[in-house]
């Protein structure tokens, strides 16, 4: 009763959670764990979060460490409001990537375009990118135009998926929200408003990214609260 009547409590919501996408092609790449890719979480044409690392394609959308961290930057999920732009070749500029593609095509003259991408992309993703590029799969690589090649490069640097929503809350690593930290003594975790009331873990409006930070918050707040209670 004291919590509800006197404390400021932010509504609970899932965080560090995989996302579902509008695009169905992701299911064809399900299970593919991309490493060393860059991603941007976009909202209204602006990047609200950027990250580099691992990204996982799933049967329903996207997951993995970068996506889980990105989910923490979505205060309220609205279908169609957010998108994720993936740079599959972040180490290369568009010019460098175009030179790489041109070199690969030169080494594979007479090969089908769709087959030529297997040296550039994971086998599971290559046919998807080939289809998204709009270049006919059976077209010989030496027949691909300069503009088509550059469009392919732009696709590789900006593969975009549109977010439909979060996965079920049961799949979230944590929930965010809870009792305001301003109303809790950080040394003892005791309520500043209700003496004798202590808080720990996810009931507090305090959370972090993946990587053990939330476990540390839980352990540290629980230890502080238990120590304070034992000495009260």
Where are the language model's segments positioned?
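Short, compositionally biased leader-like segments
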Residues: 6-12, 158, 166
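An anion/pyrophosphate-binding glycine-rich loop and adjacent beta-alpha core
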Residues: 7-143
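Short Asp/Glu-rich motifs
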Residues: 21-22, 175, 227
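Gly/Ser/Thr-rich beta-alpha loop segments that engage phosphate groups in nucleotides
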Residues: 63-66, 179-180, 203, 210-214
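Predominant activation on well-ordered alpha-helical scaffold segments within soluble catalytic domains
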Residues: 67-68, 150-153, 157, 219-227
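A glycine-rich dinucleotide-binding beta-alpha-beta segment and adjacent secondary-structure elements
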Residues: 127-207
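A conserved FAD-binding loop/helix module that cradles the flavin
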Residues: 206-232
